């Protein structure tokens, strides 16, 4: 009788592992990857907020799309799809500033980290909210998303 329960437990464990259920080590890895992503997003927000009023007002005219509901790592695909427009906006405003290299480094870091975190799932399609957001709102919302995911892993 106990043998059947034991075998059922093993089968369930194998099914979870095979379907990429989070394990303790993957949770730690995810947390380690989320930290630099969060720092890079915060850096970009700080850079955006440091612009002169004229540049910031111009940057705020560009609109970005946010997913309707971002609650899982797979939703990072939506961030990835908006990285190119974000980089273009930041480059426009930074054209004569020495921080351009730092911004490019942060954008590259974000791109690599998001690719690692979201995994190889290619079938996910983002469902975007109808309303667009400014660059400041965009960065704030993704920072909040990362903090939320991070807090669920603790």
Swiss-Prot record:
Subcellular location: Secreted
Cellular-component GO terms for this entry: extracellular space
Native source species: Camelus bactrianus
S-S bridge residues: 78-126
Coiled-coil intervals: none
Signal peptide extent: 1-20
InterPro entries (alphabetical): 4_helix_cytokine-like_core, IL-2, IL-2_CS
Name assigned to this protein: Interleukin-2
Similarity remark: Belongs to the IL-2 family.
């Amino acid at each position: 009788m106990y043998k059947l329960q034991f075998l059922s437990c093993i089968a369930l464990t194998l099914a979870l592992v095979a379907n990429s259920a989070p394990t303790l080590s993957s949770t730690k890895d995810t947390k380690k990857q989320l930290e630099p992503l969060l720092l890079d997003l915060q850096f970009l927000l700080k850079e955006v907020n440091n612009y002169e009023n004229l540049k910031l007002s111009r940057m705020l005219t560009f609109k970005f799309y946010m997913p309707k509901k971002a609650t899982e790592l797979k939703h990072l695909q939506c961030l990835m799809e908006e990285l190119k427009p974000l980089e273009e906006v930041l480059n426009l405003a930074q054209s004569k500033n020495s921080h351009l290299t730092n911004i490019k480094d942060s954008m590259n870091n974000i791109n690599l980290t998001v690719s690692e975190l979201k995994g190889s799932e290619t079938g996910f399609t983002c469902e975007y909210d109808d309303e667009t957001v400014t660059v400041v709102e965009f960065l704030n919302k993704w920072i909040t998303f990362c903090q939320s995911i991070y807090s669920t892993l603790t």
